[in-house]
Regions:
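Short acidic-hydrophobic, aromatic-tinged amphipathic segments that line or gate anion-handling sites
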Residues: 99-103
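Short, flexible, glycine/charge-rich loop motifs used to bind or transfer phosphoryl groups or to couple energy/partner
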Residues: 2-4, 34-35, 109
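Short, charged, intrinsically disordered terminal tails
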Residues: 106-112
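Short beta-strand/loop segment at the start of cytosolic alpha/beta domains
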Residues: 1-15
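Amphipathic alpha-helical interaction surfaces in cytosolic regulatory modules
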Residues: 20-98
C-alpha cells in the first residue's frame, strides 16, 4: 500500500495504490486520515484508481475513516473506483453510504456545493 498526499483547492487528496487488506494498508489509511483530521483538514478525497484489491479489513478501514471524519465535522468522499471496488460496495450496500465520483473535478466541485 502506497499513499501519496496532495492538496487541491483546500481538499486533501490521498492517492492510494496497491492493496487495502488486513495488516497491509488498512491501518495506514486510517492513521493518515486521523492525522489529517487532527491537523484541521475536514475535506478528504480518496482516489482509489490504483487500488487493485480490498478485503473486509480494508472496507472496515474505509467505514471507520468515514465515520471518524463525519464525527469530526468533515467529509470523506471516494473517486475513481475500479469496477471491482464498485461491485464490492454495491454488494455490501456501502455504495449508499459513501459519496462516489467518476472524475476528480466533479468530486472536488462537490466539496464547494
Amino acid at each position: 500500500m502506497d499513499i501519496k498526499e496532495r492538496v487541491v483547492g483546500g481538499v486533501s487528496i490521498l492517492d492510494l495504490s496497491g492493496k487495502i487488506v488486513l495488516g497491509e494498508g488498512d491501518m495506514q489509511v486510517k492513521e493518515r486520515i486521523r492525522d489529517l483530521l487532527a491537523d484541521g483538514q475536514r475535506r478528504i478525497l480518496l482516489n482509489l484508481a490504483e487500488v487493485n484489491y480490498i478485503d473486509s479489513a480494508g472496507l472496515g478501514a474505509l467505514i471507520s475513516s468515514y465515520t471518524t471524519a463525519k464525527r469530526d465535522g468533515g467529509s470523506l468522499k471516494l473517486v475513481n473506483l475500479t469496477k471491482r471496488i464498485q461491485d464490492l460496495l454495491a454488494i455490501t450496500k456501502l455504495i449508499t453510504v459513501f459519496e462516489t465520483f467518476d472524475a476528480e473535478a466533479e468530486a472536488l466541485a462537490s466539496f464547494s456545493a
